[in-house]
């Protein structure tokens, strides 16, 4: 499908400054791929999804998990819960003709329940936990630094975005002790759901399926 418009290359190199995509080979054999024709998983790709967003012909697409989700929803032995990112309830309405930014929280929850999800959660809850963890971590680092421990790395940077963490790992490997050690809200919710919440509800962990509806493709990479 690729028409060699090179929009993916431009957004990857000039906007995101990742540099994972470029033109390789020559003439009729030219293609857009990572350097040395490496697999995308072996490249500097951060899975931010911007190349997919700007591709005008659908030559680049994300991995689709719809069939897997439908199988879980149809399985009576599974308890399927879903978490939605705050951005989703603000952006979803535009797809249905509502003014940009219109909140559709109630409609979204109703629709998800009608689709077959057993429980619907807001990732805001897990985001609060992440903020508490990051706050405790920065207080700990500052306390140690003020007590004379000069090995403490400051400032502390958030680890909420998997694309950002991936970018940092590839481009600043000598500073990996600067980002927070806290999990992202998505991952923190998954841990809480499969331990504390599952125990409280009396649901066996192996029967629980946690689904995330997120605005960023990097969340798929993070789950894998």
Where are these predicted regions, by residue range?
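Iron-sulfur-associated redox domains of electron-transfer enzymes in respiratory
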Residues: 61-224
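Non-heme iron-sulfur electron-transfer modules
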Residues: 14-43, 58-80
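Cysteine-centered iron-sulfur cluster-binding motifs in ferredoxin-type domains/subunits
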Residues: 1-15, 37-58
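A near-ubiquitous, low-amplitude feature marking generic local secondary-structure context
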Residues: 15, 28-31, 38, 52-56, ...
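Short N-terminal signal/transit or membrane-insertion segments
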Residues: 11-15, 22, 55, 88, ...
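Glycine-centered flexibility sites
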Residues: 27, 49-51, 58, 116, ...
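Short charge-dense sequence patches
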Residues: 3-6, 22, 53-66, 140-142
């Amino acid at each position: 499908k690729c028409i060699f418009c090179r929009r993916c290359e431009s957004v990857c190199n000039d906007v995101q400054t990742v540099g994972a995509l470029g033109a390789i080979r020559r003439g009729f054999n030219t293609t857009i791929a990572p350097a040395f024709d490496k697999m995308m998983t072996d490249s500097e790709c951060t899975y931010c999804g911007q190349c997919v967003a700007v591709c005008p012909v659908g030559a680049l697409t994300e991995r689709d998990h719809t069939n897997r989700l439908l199988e879980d929803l149809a399985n009576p032995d599974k308890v399927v819960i879903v978490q939605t990112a705050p951005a989703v309830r603000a952006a979803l309405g535009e797809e249905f003709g509502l003014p940009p930014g219109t909140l559709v929280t109630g409609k979204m929850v109703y629709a998800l329940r009608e689709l077959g999800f057993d429980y619907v959660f807001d990732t805001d809850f897990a985001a609060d936990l992440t903020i508490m963890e990051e706050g405790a971590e920065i207080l700990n680092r500052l306390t140690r630094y003020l007590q004379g421990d000069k090995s403490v790395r400051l400032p502390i940077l958030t680890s909420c975005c998997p694309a950002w963490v991936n970018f940092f790992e590839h481009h600043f490997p000598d500073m990996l002790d600067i980002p927070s050690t806290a999990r992202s809200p998505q991952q923190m919710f998954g841990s809480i759901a499969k331990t504390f919440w599952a125990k409280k509800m009396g649901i066996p962990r192996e029967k629980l399926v946690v689904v995330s509806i997120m605005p960023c493709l990097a969340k798929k990479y993070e789950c894998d």
